[in-house]
Design a protein with these regions (language model features):
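C-terminal cap/substrate-recognition subdomain and adjoining C-terminal extension
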Residues: 27-47, 55-168
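A metal-dependent, Asp-based hydrolase signature
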Residues: 1-25
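Conserved phosphate-coupling serine/threonine residues in phosphotransfer and NTP-handling enzymes
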Residues: 52
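Short, mixed-charge, low-aromatic patches
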Residues: 12-20, 39-48
Length: 168
């Protein structure tokens, strides 16, 4: 609870976004082509955690409708905390930093990965299908311990160029 008018407006806006997402038909927001194949493959080698800033109820519904939930072990959503906090929680449970690969499509995803020292694989805007198709190569590098370093740096550079953002 807060008396801060800005915080109240932000909370109201967040609730409206969640309500509007619930009104969009699930058939109108299918996963990108290649997503299921990538999850199925990754599931053979790793625990899969959905880490999203979205509403837990909506994500659960979407992932069930498209039968993606079967490939996941845990859902961490806006109700769980910010992405960086969620990654820290996973690390506290015993995951090693170089054994965590965050897959994301937003600058905040990269920032959360970098802020916690975990690895990052980008899904490029307007190249989502291609990004998911290339994921098998990234997963191979990841499972063989070759992801960190040059391979990851190249992926991050592609991501930053795709979004026209400056690298740090």
């Amino acid at each position: 609870k807060t008396e801060n008018i800005c915080m109240k407006k932000a909370l109201d806006w967040s609730r409206l976004v969640n309500q509007s997402m619930a009104m969009v038909s699930d058939t109108k927001k299918p996963p990108f082509e290649g997503t299921e194949d990538a999850l199925r493959l990754a599931r053979e080698y790793a625990d899969i955690v959905i880490l999203t800033a979205a509403n837990r109820q909506e994500i659960n519904k979407e992932w069930e409708v498209f039968e993606l939930a079967q490939y996941t072990d845990l859902l961490m959503s806006q109700e769980t905390g910010r992405k960086e906090e969620c990654l820290k929680t996973l690390l506290e449970k015993g995951y090693e930093r170089d054994h965590v690969l965050m897959v994301g499509d937003a600058p905040g995803d990269l920032a959360a990965a970098q802020g916690t020292g975990v690895l990052f694989y980008p899904i490029l805007a307007y190249q989502e299908r291609e990004s998911w198709e290339k994921f098998s190569k990234a997963l191979e590098c990841f499972t063989e311990g070759r992801y960190a370093g040059v391979y990851q740096e190249e992926r991050i550079k592609e991501f930053q160029e795709n979004l026209h953002i400056e690298g740090k």
